[in-house]
């Protein structure tokens, strides 16, 4: 039976934009007036401006001493057809100091019909004639993908990966336990999750991945999802030129060397100057800049210093043949004045796509950060390097550089990152990058001549760099406001219609809801206001959005894996989150994930926090659906926590420690020791600290391989009993209004 993906038939409503094309053809008899022409021959150019579109201002090149210029230059504007769009045409004269306006005219775009193309003459000063060619068409192929379904590339990956996993599971589990794997359809979907926790999470996850690789578990996984510190390890691993041919063991040796150095070495004046020069280039191109950009550079220099030009898109070559699990990364979109725990949209990143499932909007990775309007790119920038994304994914730790540098807390209110930059730049900076302004919209028409400006731009840049360095090492709001710490990108959903809300689980009313009452949903895990505003939409009028570390809401990347389109059967999660002590209950983040899932009607096994009281601290806990027959879509969760229990006694599973040296190396606490090197804010790991944490999680994982294997066998059996695990019957559809009419009218087989 072929698999039908019902999600591809759900309509994600969006309105098509219009593309307005203007060709500036020519002008004749350009004049500065009788007196002006006596003094100088015009150097004409044309400015085009439409205030209702983000990339609003365009200009032609200028011709020296030419009263009959022929430009033949083409410009495109993406327009909202519901707006009153007016084209302002300005004829300019380029001068060395200040350009001069020679005349203006306007054209109402709504006077044209879609599909129409015509030449329109404009008269300036009763003498000059300028001719423009204009055309209007519908943008029927937006750059955003509007869909609730997985992208075709991920679907192809899943099919290829299932064949690989089927053989790997047979080898791992043996003939008896894998006899249910008759075809790829019987293969359960296994996901591995890593939490946040700074370098502690990164180092711990390195030990986990080594164990999963050696044991063969990694070959049975479809996804590896990370958050914050875990994404740093995933980025290091997947960007390594020798992975997956070379396993984590050798790559982890390189990692240990990289994190043994003092991070202050990365903040020498010479290196900071290089960082800021890169930021100058980015800012000058019209992109927002925050301290997260610098933080990403520092993380990149530490972990992937010899591949700083690597991009997320380039990681596709690691997964295109399905030889390793698909990596999934995450950050949050947040609102400037609302707690992340109250409101946050989860943004997912893969080598194939970046987007927000809540709105059914996705884009190719190389478009993230570009300027969009109504789903169409209006200004494309170079793809952000992987280290920039690493800074965004772990941006909560950008504040730690206050501590590293000894910067005291600034109490200045209302001082944004952009205002801070404005204070230390000159008026010649290309864009002021204010949080919600459009640079081009606010440029004065009489601007300095570009050629003249180039003569002293380098001096201004040098001054900007000098002041930026001073800001980095002084008491600065750059460090002390969310505006300064949070990443910021152009809003790729600018101008979209979000009147329709799309639940993350639009197709089913899961039976798990029956066992989860309103009192439980109202019960607070960490904060009385947690998730209070998660149903609110993104502001589609804001020109830029804040993107921050997902750990600021909860520290496990379950939202990526719980998308029903991915149909995950078994989740193996590793939680490196900080706890008050080694003996503290380890379920806070998991309980937050459970509550978030229930509020989004996503299947999740009941988490019983009292298992800690009954069984004490363990290396891992297993949570299963209470009633598998009724909860067919509910995954099983194996939850590993950061705990040093059996590792103190055994150097390998079943192999006791014998010498005093072996016992001493394993005798350490993680959270109880006030001198512990495993603090969330520690970004330097001596070799011994690295090996201790790495080997601890390597041991804990290997020590529970049988638990993982048993869960895999059960997942195979669940698949056998529920062959339509990934598909959804229309009889279970909760929100049929989302389906297109053609799909609903088809006869049911």
From Swiss-Prot:
Q: So where does Ca(2+) 2 get bound?
A: 40, 43, 93-95
**Residue ranges of every copy of the C2 domain listed in the record:** 6-122
Show the PROSITE patterns listed in the entry: C2, PLA2C
Record PTM: Phosphorylated at both Ser-505 and Ser-727 in response to mitogenic stimuli.
Summarizing the annotation, the consequence of altering residue 111 to P is: In GURDP; uncertain significance
- Record region (Disordered): 409-457
Mutagenesis / variant outcome for changing residue 215 to A: No effect on phospholipase or lysophospholipase activity
Provide the protein name: Cytosolic phospholipase A2
Q: What is the lineage of its organism?
A: Eukaryota, Metazoa, Chordata, Craniata, Vertebrata
């Amino acid at each position: 039976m072929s698999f039908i993906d019902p999600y591809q038939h759900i309509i994600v409503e969006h309105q098509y934009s219009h593309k307005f094309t203007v060709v500036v053809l020519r002008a004749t008899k350009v004049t500065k007036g009788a007196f002006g022409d006596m003094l100088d021959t015009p150097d004409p150019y044309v400015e085009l401006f439409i205030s209702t579109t983000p990339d609003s201002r365009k200009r032609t090149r200028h011709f020296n001493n030419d009263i009959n210029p022929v430009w033949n230059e083409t410009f495109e504007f993406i327009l909202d057809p519901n707006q009153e769009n007016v084209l302002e045409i300005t004829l300019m004269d380029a001068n060395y100091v200040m350009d001069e306006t020679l005349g203006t005219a306007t054209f109402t775009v709504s006077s044209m019909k879609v599909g129409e193309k015509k030449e329109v003459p404009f008269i300036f000063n009763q003498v000059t004639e300028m001719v423009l060619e204009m055309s209007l068409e519908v943008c029927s192929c937006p750059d955003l993908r509007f869909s609730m379904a997985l992208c075709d590339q991920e679907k192809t990956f899943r099919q290829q990966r299932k064949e690989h996993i089927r053989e790997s599971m047979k080898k791992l589990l043996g003939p008896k336990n894998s006899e249910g794997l008759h075809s790829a359809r019987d293969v359960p979907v296994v996901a591995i999750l890593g939490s946040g926790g700074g370098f502690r999470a990164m180092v711990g996850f390195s030990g986990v991945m080594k164990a999963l690789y050696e044991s063969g578990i990694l070959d049975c996984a479809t996804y590896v999802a990370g958050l914050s510190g875990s994404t740093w390890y995933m980025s290091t691993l997947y960007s390594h030129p020798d992975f997956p041919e070379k396993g984590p063991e050798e790559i982890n040796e390189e990692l240990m060397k990289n994190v043994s150095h003092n991070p202050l070495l990365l903040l020498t004046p010479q290196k900071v100057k290089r960082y800021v020069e890169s930021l100058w280039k980015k800012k000058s191109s019209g992109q927002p800049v925050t301290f997260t950009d610098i933080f990403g550079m520092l993380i990149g220099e530490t972990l992937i210093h010899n591949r700083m030009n690597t991009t997320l898109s380039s990681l596709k070559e690691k997964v295109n043949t399905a030889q390793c699990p698909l990596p999934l990364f995450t950050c949050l979109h947040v609102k400037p004045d609302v707690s992340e725990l109250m409101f946050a949209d989860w943004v997912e990143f893969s080598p194939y796509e970046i987007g927000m499932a809540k709105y059914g909007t996705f884009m190719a990775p190389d478009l993230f950060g570009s300027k969009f309007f109504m789903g169409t790119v209006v200004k494309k920038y170079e793809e952000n390097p992987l280290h920039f994304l690493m800074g965004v994914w772990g941006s909560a730790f950008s504040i730690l550089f206050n501590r590293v540098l000894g910067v005291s807390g600034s109490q200045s209110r209302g001082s944004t990152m952009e205002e801070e930059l404005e204070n230390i730049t000159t008026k010649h900076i290309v864009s002021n990058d204010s949080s919600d302004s459009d640079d081009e919209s606010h440029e004065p028409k009489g601007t300095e001549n570009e050629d003249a400006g180039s003569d002293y731009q380098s001096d201004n840049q040098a001054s900007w760099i000098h002041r930026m360095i001073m800001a980095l090492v002084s008491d600065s709001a750059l460090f002390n406001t969310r505006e300064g710490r949070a990443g910021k990108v152009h809003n790729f959903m600018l101008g979209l219609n979000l009147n329709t809300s799309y639940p993350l689980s639009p197709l089913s009313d899961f039976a798990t809801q029956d066992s989860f009452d309103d009192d439980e949903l109202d019960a607070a895990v960490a904060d009385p206001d947690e998730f209070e505003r998660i149903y609110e939409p993104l502001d589609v009028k804001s020109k830029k959005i804040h993107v921050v570390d997902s750990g600021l809401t909860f520290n496990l990347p379950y939202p990526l894996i719980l998308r029903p389109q991915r149909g995950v059967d078994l989740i193996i999660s590793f939680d490196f989150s900080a706890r008050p002590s080694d003996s503290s209950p380890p379920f806070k983040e998991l309980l937050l994930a459970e509550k978030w899932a229930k509020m989004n009607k996503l299947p999740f096994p009941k988490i019983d926090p009292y298992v800690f009281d009954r069984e004490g601290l363990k290396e891992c806990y297993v949570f299963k659906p209470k009633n598998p027959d009724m909860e067919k879509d509910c995954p099983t969760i194996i939850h590993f926590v950061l705990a040093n229990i059996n590792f103190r006694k055994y150097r390998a599973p079943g192999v006791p420690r014998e010498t005093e040296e072996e016992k001493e190396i394993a005798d350490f606490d993680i959270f109880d020791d006030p001198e512990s090197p495993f603090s969330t804010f520690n970004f330097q790991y001596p070799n011994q600290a690295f090996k201790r944490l790495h080997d601890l999680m390597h041991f804990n994982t290997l020590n529970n391989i049988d638990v993982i294997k048993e869960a895999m066998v059960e997942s195979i059996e669940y698949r056998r009993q529920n062959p339509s695990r990934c598909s959804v019957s229309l009889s279970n559809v909760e929100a049929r209004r989302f389906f297109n009419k053609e799909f609903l009218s088809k006869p049911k087989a």
